Amino acid sequence: MKEIATEYSFIKYTELELDDNGSIKQLSIPNKYNVIYAIAINDELVYIGKTKNLRKRINYYRTAINRKDKTSDSTKSALIHSALKEGSKVEFYARQCFNLSMTNELGTMTIATIDLEEPLFIKLFNPPWNIQHKKK
């Protein structure tokens, strides 16, 4: 993951840890907005996603394992919890995205790079948890 982070401008955001009760500790770090994020387990990239609010997304992964209605996020939550309980290192990386605005005689158009970058990184790295993008 370190090579990917260096080459593609991902910065380490946080490393998750378990508390004494076996729950993921609450984050107490500044938030990141409009980012592509990567989850790495023992320095291996396992997932690429996008979010408008990274701390909120990670907090959702912290608690989604306990929700009655299962989603793809609860699946990732269970995988993250399992990795931590096995003693693996779970880290989140972030790459800042921007909105590009172009103006011509017809007006202004804005494109969010987050929507362009996420599928490109998924295709480039083919992370195992990105099953929605796997070829059928």
Swiss-Prot record:
It catalyses: Endonucleolytic nicking and cleavage of cytosine-containing double-stranded DNA. It is an enzyme of class 3 (hydrolase). GO terms for molecular function: DNA binding; endonuclease activity; metal ion binding. Changing L84P: Nearly abolishes endonuclease activity. Changing G49A: Nearly abolishes endonuclease activity. Residues 32-131 form the GIY-YIG domain. InterPro entries: EndoII-like_GIY-YIG, GIY-YIG_endonuc, GIY-YIG_endonuc_sf, Host_DNA_Degrad_Endo, Phage_T4_DenA_endoDNaseII. Contributes to the degradation of host DNA, permitting the scavenging of host-derived nucleotides for phage DNA synthesis. Sequence-specific endonuclease. Catalyzes nicking of the bottom strand of double-stranded DNA between the first and second base pair to the right of a top-strand CCGC motif. Does not cleave native phage DNA, which contains 5-hydroxymethylcytosine instead of cytosine. Homotetramer. This is Endonuclease II. The gene is denA.
